[in-house]
Design a protein with these regions (language model features):
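Alpha-helical transmembrane segments of multi-pass membrane proteins
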Residues: 1-414
C-alpha cells in the first residue's frame, strides 16, 4: 500500500510538471496573436427559464447525493460477490469513473440538438433509479456463470486470475449501465444552467460544487445512517426511490413537454419502480448472498444487516447450521467448524500456570469457544465482539454455546 501511494504521488508530480511545460510553450506560441471576441449568447435554442435552471441545480445536488450513497451501498454489497473488500472498492471505483466518462462522452454527441433538456434530465434520473435497484438481483442471478468457472481445472495456474477476472468483468458489466446514466447528468445540467459564454466558468463551477456537496452528504448518510437504520437492501431501494422521484419531478415541471406525455412518462416509470421494489422486497432478491452461501444454503434461518457486517444463519443441504459474516462461514455445527473452536478454548488454559485466570476472547462466533473456556476454573471471561448481530444469532446454536450469554461469569463487550 505504501509503495502504491508513493507511485501515485510521483505520477501526480510528473503530470504537474508536464502541464507547466505545456503552459509555458502555449504562452510563447500565442504571443502576438490578437484574441477573438467571443459570442455572448451561448445557444439561443438552449435558453431555459431561471426556474428550470434552479430545478436543474437542485437535481444535480440530489443526484450527487444518490450517486455517492449508491457507491457506498454497492461497495458493501459487492463484498459478497467478490469475496474481498479491496476488489469490491476497486470494481465500484472503476465502474463509476468509466461510467462517468462514457456517459459524458455519449451525451455530448446529442446534447446540442435536444430541446427538452429538463425532460431528458428527468428521464435519465428515472432510469438511474430503476437500474440501481436491478443491479444486486442481476449480480445474484449470475451465480451459474461463477459455477462454470468453479468447474475448471483446479491445477490451472491461471485459475485464480480467471476466477477474479470473470467476477470483475461480470460486476463491471452490471454496474456500468447505471454509472453511464449518472455520467450523463452533469453535462445536461451544465447545458441548462449555463446562460452565456461569459458565465461558463461560474455556472459550471456552481454546478460542480453543488454536485460534490451532495456527494459528500450522500456518502456520509449512507454509511452512518441508512445502513444502520435500514440495512443495505432497503437503503438501495430508498436511494433508488429518491432518484426516481427526482426524475418524476423534473418531468412534471418541464414546460416544454406536452401534458399528456408527462403524465404517461411519470405513470409508467413510477409504476415500474413500485412493482420492482415490492417484488424484490417480497422475494428477498436483494438479500446479500455470496457464492458459497448460494451454493450451500438450503434454508435461511436468520438474516441481519448492520453497519459492521451482514450476519446470516443458514442450513445447508446436509442439515447443518452455519453462521456467515459478509458471506464467509465462520462457525456452525459442521464437524470441521465445530472442532476448530475447541482448541481455542482448551489449549491456552491447559498450558496456563495461572490459577483462576481472567480470560479475554476476541470474537463470539457461535459461542463454542466462550462456553469451552467456562468449563475451567476461571474468574471471568470477557468476550469482545465488533458486530452486534453475531451474538444475536446465538439462539440458533444452543448445542454449541449452551446458553453462555446468560452465564454470570461471562461478560460480552460490544
Amino acid at each position: 500500500v505504501r509503495e502504491a501511494a508513493y507511485l501515485a504521488g510521483a505520477l501526480n508530480l510528473l503530470i504537474a510538471g508536464a502541464v507547466f511545460i505545456l503552459d509555458l510553450r502555449a504562452r510563447r506560441s500565442s504571443e502576438g496573436i490578437k484574441p477573438v471576441e467571443p459570442r455572448r449568447q451561448l445557444v439561443p435554442d438552449a435558453a431555459v427559464s431561471s426556474r428550470a435552471a434552479r430545478m436543474a441545480l437542485w437535481a444535480i445536488g440530489l443526484s450527487g447525493f444518490c450517486a455517492l450513497a449508491l457507491e457506498v451501498l454497492w461497495t458493501r454489497a459487492l463484498v459478497f460477490f467478490l469475496d474481498n473488500s479491496t476488489h469490491a472498492f476497486t470494481t465500484i471505483l472503476t465502474a463509476f469513473l468509466l461510467g462517468i466518462a462514457l456517459g459524458s462522452a455519449l451525451i455530448a454527441r446529442f446534447i446540442d440538438t435536444r430541446k427538452r433538456l429538463l425532460y431528458w434530465l428527468g428521464a435519465v434520473e428515472v432510469l438511474i433509479g430503476i437500474f440501481a435497484i436491478l443491479a444486486i438481483p442481476i449480480l445474484s442471478s449470475s451465480t451459474p456463470v461463477i459455477q462454470t468457472m468453479a468447474r475448471m481445472n483446479p491445477a490451472d495456474p491461471m485459475l485464480p486470475w480467471k476466477w477474479m477476472g470473470m467476477r470483475f468483468v461480470t460486476t463491471l458489466g452490471v454496474m456500468l449501465l447505471p454509472t453511464v446514466l449518472i455520467g450523463m447528468t452533469f453535462p445536461i445540467v451544465g447545458k441548462i444552467y449555463t446562460r452565456t459564454i461569459d458565465t461558463v466558468g461560474t455556472a459550471l463551477g456552481r454546478v460542480y460544487a453543488v454536485n460534490t456537496l451532495g456527494g459528500v452528504f450522500g456518502s456520509a448518510v449512507a454509511g452512518f445512517a441508512l445502513v444502520p437504520l435500514l440495512g443495505v437492501q432497503a437503503s438501495v431501494i430508498a436511494v433508488s426511490a429518491l432518484n426516481t422521484c427526482i426524475g418524476i419531478a423534473l418531468i412534471l415541471f418541464d414546460p416544454a413537454t406536452a401534458r399528456r406525455a408527462r403524465i404517461v412518462t411519470v405513470a409508467g416509470s413510477g409504476g415500474l419502480f413500485l412493482v420492482l421494489g415490492a417484488f424484490f422486497l417480497r422475494e428477498g432478491a436483494l438479500d446479500l448472498t455470496s457464492y458459497t452461501e448460494r451454493i450451500d444454503s438450503a434454508e435461511v434461518l436468520s438474516y441481519e444487516e448492520g453497519i459492521g457486517a451482514t450476519v446470516k444463519v443458514f442450513r445447508d443441504h446436509y442439515g447443518d447450521k452455519l453462521l456467515s459474516i459478509n458471506g464467509f462461514p465462520v462457525a456452525g455445527t459442521p464437524l470441521g467448524l465445530h472442532d476448530a473452536q475447541k482448541p481455542l478454548a482448551h489449549l491456552p488454559l491447559l498450558l496456563s500456570p495461572v490459577p483462576s485466570p481472567k480470560v479475554n476472547l476476541i470474537g463470539f462466533g457461535a459461542g463454542g469457544a466462550s462456553w469451552g473456556v467456562l468449563q475451567y476454573d476461571v474468574e471471568r471471561v470477557d468476550c469482545v465482539e465488533l458486530v452486534p448481530a453475531v451474538p444475536n444469532a446465538a439462539e440458533w446454536f444452543p448445542e454449541i454455546n449452551h446458553g453462555v450469554l446468560s452465564e454470570p461469569r461471562f461478560n460480552l463487550i460490544m
